[in-house]
Amino acid sequence: MNASDFRRRGKEMVDYMADYLEGIEGRQVYPDVQPGYLRPLIPATAPQEPDTFEDILQDVEKIIMPGVTHWHSPYFFAYFPTASSYPAMLADMLCGAIGCIGFSWAASPACTELETVMMDWLGKMLQLPEAFLAGEAGEGGGVIQGSASEATLVALLAARTKVVRRLQAASPGLTQGAVLEKLVAYASDQAHSSVERAGLIGGVKLKAIPSDGKFAMRASALQEALERDKAAGLIPFFVVATLGTTSCCSFDNLLEVGPICHEEDIWLHVDAAYAGSAFICPEFRHLLNGVEFADSFNFNPHKWLLVNFDCSAMWVKRRTDLTGAFKLDPVYLKHSHQGSGLITDYRHWQLPLGRRFRSLKMWFVFRMYGVKGLQAYIRKHVQLSHEFEAFVLQDPRFEVCAEVTLGLVCFRLKGSDGLNEALLERINSARKIHLVPCRLRGQFVLRFAICSRKVESGHVRLAWEHIRGLAAELLAAEEGKAEIKS
């Protein structure tokens, strides 16, 4: 493919992408395929001679699309949103064209410097404390990670290195192994599974703190666990507070948990993967109160801020906490500016070496939507979730299972877990909408998350009518079974 072909095929691909997204409502949201469907449709080996672009694009529609779950359909209400917007897609195209690997300032100065500035832009949109911003000579700063899971792991490993070095400095004969076997990290019992995985990878104990009636971690429960573990000779070193849990979008109490971590000299990491985008709206910023106590904070613009995956924003108050844990300088990566104090080498802030020019997506989206446009997008999703909540509350057969704060409604049929499992099976088997479940206080609960950029009130109403209809069929069938038994 030469430049002339690229121009022509590029226009065709943009047309295909735009047609796909604008017509996505007409596609079945959840695929009707079985595991292994794709292998028989594709040759067992790569072609010896080139295929044509026309054949490839036809195969996309014939082979790939039947197996796609359409996350951007207005009838997709599962998980949490994954962001999508035309400005971000255009920026991704440019990122692919530039094709730099921005592991250091010297490897691509614009890649590094735009990321630093965009993370400051975003931090100011969130009204983060000044300590988290890079500015021109700040001690903190932001970095784009691949996911919130990565950000949590990076924070845990940095905290682990910091406490090991501190204890070894106080007791020079102390081995790293002796410290590691006593380290304990903590998170709410509602925290994401990636927190547990970070503990496994980091080789430290992770303990779940029981949440309160609103599914939040509170000071009393955390303090009790800390005192118990310290009395047993263990060393608390790391706490993850979640703002907007995956199960029900609950919020740990930072204003209670933060001071405890500060007093105990425990690293506090705040994970707001989904909810963080909402903090650009003044009416939701109070949910972030207490972040001033945190050592690190992250959320995913690639969930709800119209910046395509992957783009997970992470800030730290002290960049030396990261560089102190991860810095390695082989001669082939060194450059003449690294000791100047004027630049950032982001390879020292992350687990991989290589990194894409991801800040281009932020730059395009922030400029083409503006803060007001992004705020309007968030507010619309929140409004739609409250519309669905109202539908549920009006039907005496159903109940809302957790407070609706942002774009997620947790609900269920009043009755057994089996009844709700059967309802979810009917919903997803019909393939008109797509939902996933969670468990709250041991109960099987359905989650309705507002996800698509194109979702409107009409889609929410149709989804609710569909759920109500399937519930009526299910309840009638259950009633019939009961009559037969009696």
UniProtKB/Swiss-Prot annotation:
It holds the Pfam family Pyridoxal_deC. Pathway: Catecholamine biosynthesis; dopamine biosynthesis; dopamine from L-tyrosine: step 2/2. Residues 58-178 are annotated as: 2 X approximate tandem repeats. One of its GO terms (molecular function) is L-dopa decarboxylase activity. Its EC number is 4.1.1.28. Keywords: Acetylation, Catecholamine biosynthesis, Decarboxylase, Lyase, Pyridoxal phosphate, Repeat. Substrate binds at T82, H192. The keyword Nucleotidyltransferase does not apply. It is an enzyme of class 4 (lyase). The modification N-acetylmethionine is found at M1. InterPro entries: Aromatic_deC, PyrdxlP-dep_de-COase, PyrdxlP-dep_Trfase, PyrdxlP-dep_Trfase_major, PyrdxlP-dep_Trfase_small, Pyridoxal-P_BS. PROSITE patterns: DDC_GAD_HDC_YDC. Gene3D superfamilies: Aspartate Aminotransferase, domain 1 (3.90.1150.10), dopa decarboxylase, N-terminal domain (1.20.1340.10), Type I PLP-dependent aspartate aminotransferase-like (Major domain) (3.40.640.10). It comes from the Eukaryota. Pyridoxal 5'-phosphate binds at A148, S149, T246, N300. Its cofactor is pyridoxal 5'-phosphate. GO terms for biological process: amino acid metabolic process; carboxylic acid metabolic process; catecholamine metabolic process; dopamine biosynthetic process; serotonin biosynthetic process. The modification N6-(pyridoxal phosphate)lysine is found at K303. GO terms for cellular component: cytoplasm. Sequence repeats lie at residues 58-115, 118-178. Belongs to the group II decarboxylase family. Homodimer. This is Aromatic-L-amino-acid decarboxylase. The gene is DDC.
